[in-house]
Amino acid sequence: METWQEVTVHVHRDAQEAVSYVLIETGSQGVAIADSADYIGQKDRFGELYPDVEQSDMIAITAYYPSSTNLADVIATINEQLAELASFGLQVGQVTVDSQELAEEDWADNWKKYYEPARITHDLTIVPSWTAYDASAGEKVIKLDPGMAFGTGTHPTTKMSLFALEQILRGGETVIDVGTGSGVLSIASSLLGAKTIYAYDLDDVAVRVAQENIDLNQGTDNIHVAAGDLLKGVSQEADVIVANILADILVLLTDDAYRLVKKEGYLILSGIISEKLDMVLEAAFSAGFFLETHMVQGEWNALVFKKTDDISGVIGG
């Protein structure tokens, strides 16, 4: 029986995406995230047994490596990368790293125990595909099986993106989802009434996973998933473009986004750590957008821009 090596990194919640990326880059075959914020108030509602996660600002990110991996070298690299992240101003907290061996069948399913139904916005709830769930009146349920390499939709950057979509979509819109990942933003757009959604990702695995998740949700045949490099080569205009990716990538798509967003349409940008906020604002303003909403959770920022000639109540442009 093949065994796997499990490495758990305890860091501040704000460092979740950056640290997950580091773990994948060091050879991890997937990551699972235990965040106490995802379980607050859930026990009484679902009557389930939940992981023993103490309420705090720290989270546990568990990565899985093949048994052939030199774990000492991996841990040394992780510590170096975490120190570098801290030097850039990202809040990582008091970092600790643990490791253990794991059997094949445990590796395949271990991450699922950290993934439970979560009410993300007023209307939207994300539910793992293997969990039975009774939705309340008016509640819109997104079923996800993201696999270990994709987020479960509970990260602040995703939450803010979903909140923005909920506030903007009124029904009948065309939406473009750039860097779709698990497909959660596209599925939400469909449930919120968008007429047509185009979802793009450079990663073929993401394209496959997004399509699988779309197929888990009824009434989502209006979502079209394809491989794509940001908005390059895209000619379809949209009422809303949403992108929840790294700030350094967001600045590369603002000009194309302005070309494609219809007049009075919106651009939602998320995944922005505070130290790179000005860079993203400058890129969007230079493209011609006006800022309508700025959301903040911890070190993370989400921005809602509008393409408009009516600049009352908006900033920039």
From Swiss-Prot:
The keyword Nuclease does not apply. It catalyses: L-lysyl-[protein] + 3 S-adenosyl-L-methionine = N(6),N(6),N(6)-trimethyl-L-lysyl-[protein] + 3 S-adenosyl-L-homocysteine + 3 H(+). One of its GO terms (molecular function) is protein-lysine N-methyltransferase activity. GO terms for biological process: methylation. Signal peptide: none annotated. S-adenosyl-L-methionine binds at residues 158, 179, 201, 244. It is found in: Cytoplasm. It holds the Pfam family PrmA. Its main location: cytoplasm. GO terms for cellular component: cytoplasm. Its EC number is 2.1.1.-. Coiled coil: none annotated. Keywords: Cytoplasm, Methyltransferase, S-adenosyl-L-methionine, Transferase. PANTHER family: ELECTRON TRANSFER FLAVOPROTEIN BETA SUBUNIT LYSINE METHYLTRANSFERASE (PTHR43648:SF1). HAMAP family: Methyltr_PrmA. Methylates ribosomal protein L11. Belongs to the methyltransferase superfamily. PrmA family. This is Ribosomal protein L11 methyltransferase. The gene is prmA.
